[in-house]
Amino acid sequence: MRRAVTILALVAAAARPAFADDPLARARSLYNQKQFEAAVTAAEQARATPSRADAADLVAARAYLERYRASQTSDDLTNARDRLRRIDPQRFQPRERMEYVVGLGEALYFDEAYGAAATVFDSVLQSHDQTSADARERVLDWWASALDREAKPRPDMDRQSVYVRIRSRMEEELALRPVSGTAAYWLAAAARAQGDHQSAWDSAQAGWVRSALAGGDRGAALRADLDRLVVRGIVPDRARATAQSPELLRAQWEQFKERWRPDAAMKN
């Protein structure tokens, strides 16, 4: 999973001045600020109003999932699962339904039910319903990560078909959304997982160059992710496959990065 992909922001239901009097709106705001413990507390307060109990449980569940992702504390995952199970999503608006489905996918992923998680995330990607560009980036990363985990223990023939699927979707994403850092990263990562060393190298270079499309911090995050992938994965793999020195390949990568530094044009 890419380190740089951010949390999926929850939709805000009220204006900021009302937060002090609206525990549900406050819980959503705290979640979006990554104050997950405080978000859970506010969500529990909001749950006292029966008509808002399901929405409050959704915020709490997502907050517990983020806490689990950071701490790996089993109680956080259990609490998230308990809240997701008691939600009745029938009255949710489309955006809340999407948040609920993503929460289900994340819980399945953390339960190591990777194939089921990928299926859930795929339903979100296929729907194109109420999904912002940022939300799609995150779900796309979850989907690819789940398939990657599902594929690793499989026989080689089965793994190949999984990574072909990932590469195909990432190519489609880049054609439709050239700014997608997740697609640029996974195009290289999936090629590497297939043992397609040249395509992995080429895709990493292409992703580095097109990182400017992601812009600012996101572009920098994509370059950092690609650099780790190349140095820790693609270079050693390619060195073994081609009998080239890892030091030589790392030097070639460093030279490439220097030629395509984002600020290189400013120095000429």
Descriptions of predicted regions:
Residues 162-193, 198-268:
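Eukaryotic alpha-helical solenoid repeat scaffolds
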Residues 18-70, 74-79, 253-268:
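N-terminal leader/linker segments that initiate helical-solenoid repeat arrays
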Residues 9-18:
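Hydrophobic h-region of N-terminal signal peptides that target proteins for export
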Residues 30-44, 71-85, 112-123, 155-169:
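Helix-turn-helix repeat elements of alpha-solenoid scaffolds
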Residues 64-76, 106-116, 143-159, 193-201, ...:
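Alpha-helical linker/edge segments of TPR/alpha-solenoid repeat scaffolds
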Residues 109-197, 202, 206:
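Extended amphipathic alpha-helical interaction segments
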Residues 52-68, 95-106, 134-153, 182, ...:
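Amphipathic alpha-helical repeat scaffolds of TPR domains
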Residues 46-55, 84-99, 126-139, 171-177, ...:
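Flexible helix-coil transition and linker loops at the boundaries of alpha-helical arrays
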